[in-house]
Each structure stands twice: as C-alpha cells, then as structure tokens.
Amino acid sequence: MSRYRGPRLPIIRRLGELPGFSKKIDRNHTPPGQHGWKKKASDQKKSKESQYGIRLKEKQKLRYNYGINERQLINYVREARRRKGSTGEVLLQLLEMRLDNIIYRLGFAPTIPAARQLINHGHINVNNKNINIPSYICKINDIISVLKNSQQLIKNYLQNGGISELSTCLNLNKEKLEASINNIIPRDLVKLEINELLVIEYYSRKL
C-alpha cells in the first residue's frame, strides 16, 4: 500500500485525531461518507467492531500518523522484535526517532508530511551532512540544523506559531535553528493516542 496523498478529514473521521498527519480536527465526530452526519458516533452504540477490525484500526493510525507505507511498517515491526525491550514500545521509539518526526517535533513544520518535504528538498543537515532521507533514524547526540539559505522559511513558520511544547528529549537553539537530541523519545511523550500492543498482535500471525 503506497503513502496516502488524498483528503485528510475523512481519515481523521475514521481513525480519530492524528497530530502528525494533519492539524485538522473532526469537531462534529462524524464518520466518513457523503451522509456521515446522519450517522454520528453517539448513534452507533449497536455497531461493534470485530477484534480484527480494532487491531486494523490501530495499525492504520500508526501508518497515517507517521506517513509510512505497509512495507515500511512491517520492517519496523520486524526490527522492533529483534531489539531488547517491549516490542510495542520499541516500535514507537523507531517511528518517533525518524528524521521527519524529529523535524516536526522541533516545530520546523506543521505536520510530518510537511517535514518530509523539507528533508526531500535538501533543507536539513544532520551532523553537518545533508540528509534527504525522511526515514533516517536519529540517535542521541545527533545535531540537526537547517541550511543557511533555507532558514528564513523555517523562521517564518516559527514566528507564526510553530510548536507549542518542545519535547525534553530535544534541545533547540531558535536563533541558529540548530537542535541536539538528548535522549530517545519515550512512550509517555508520544502524542498519538495508540494501543501499540494491538498493532503487534495484528502482525503476530502475518510475520
């Protein structure tokens, strides 16, 4: 399954708030579809999702929020299984430490897709090397910086709001537009409401 590039509100209506995917919020809590307003969530008490459907929904939330395709997510699950610790938590750590997510968390872009564009277009350096791979996994003590001829673009966004709260795992110099990674982003700082164990269960019989 390729990366999604269509309208975002129907996805948010189906999966709930996805902070990395879009700033949009479904204030009416209506399901997707032309007549979704007739089928508000409060009127669907009789509708019960299957266990498979619940796990699928959690998996989709991860995919859309972090902007990854099915093959990428499978690879992350496999890598999480190989590492020490809770597989679900390690999976979230891998996704949170992607360069596109770090750029988003620093407030350099409003969403992860927007952060990915900055990286793809060569605006970002890691340890003084230009990195144009959004899936690059950042490490502790990495230094993230913005190319000089690209800094005004980022400063304009920061002046218009930027990020409301910077993770304690990141240290940002707003004047230089340079940041250091102090620690791995832990589970309790993940913004997405997700049950990662259900994602691991979803793949338990597929991998």
UniProtKB/Swiss-Prot annotation:
| Bias kind Basic and acidic residues: ranges | 40-52
Task: Report whether Ribosomal protein shows up as a keyword of the record.
Answer: yes
| UniProt key word Mitochondrion | no
A GO CC term attached to the entry:
plastid
UniProt-recorded Gene Ontology molecular function terms: rRNA binding; structural constituent of ribosome
- What are the start and end residues of every segment in region (Disordered)? 20-52
Q: Where is this chain's protein located in or outside the cell?
A: Plastid
Q: Which PROSITE patterns match?
A: RIBOSOMAL_S4, S4
Main location group: plastid
Q: Which residues form the S4 RNA-binding domain?
A: 97-158
Supply one GO BP term.
Answer: translation
Family matches, as Gene3D superfamilies:
Ribosomal Protein S4 Delta 41, Chain A, domain 1, RNA-binding S4 domain
Q: Alphabetically list the UniProt keywords.
A: Plastid, Ribonucleoprotein, Ribosomal protein, RNA-binding, rRNA-binding
InterPro entries attached to this UniProt entry: Ribosomal_uS4, Ribosomal_uS4_bac-type, Ribosomal_uS4_CS, Ribosomal_uS4_N, S4_RNA-bd, S4_RNA-bd_sf
Its family? Belongs to the universal ribosomal protein uS4 family.
This protein's assembly is summarised as:
Part of the 30S ribosomal subunit. Contacts protein S5. The interaction surface between S4 and S5 is involved in control of translational fidelity.
UniProt function note: One of the primary rRNA binding proteins, it binds directly to 16S rRNA where it nucleates assembly of the body of the 30S subunit.
* Protein's name according to its UniProt entry: Small ribosomal subunit protein uS4c
Organism of provenance: Prototheca wickerhamii
Q: What is the lineage of its organism?
A: Eukaryota, Viridiplantae, Chlorophyta, core chlorophytes, Trebouxiophyceae
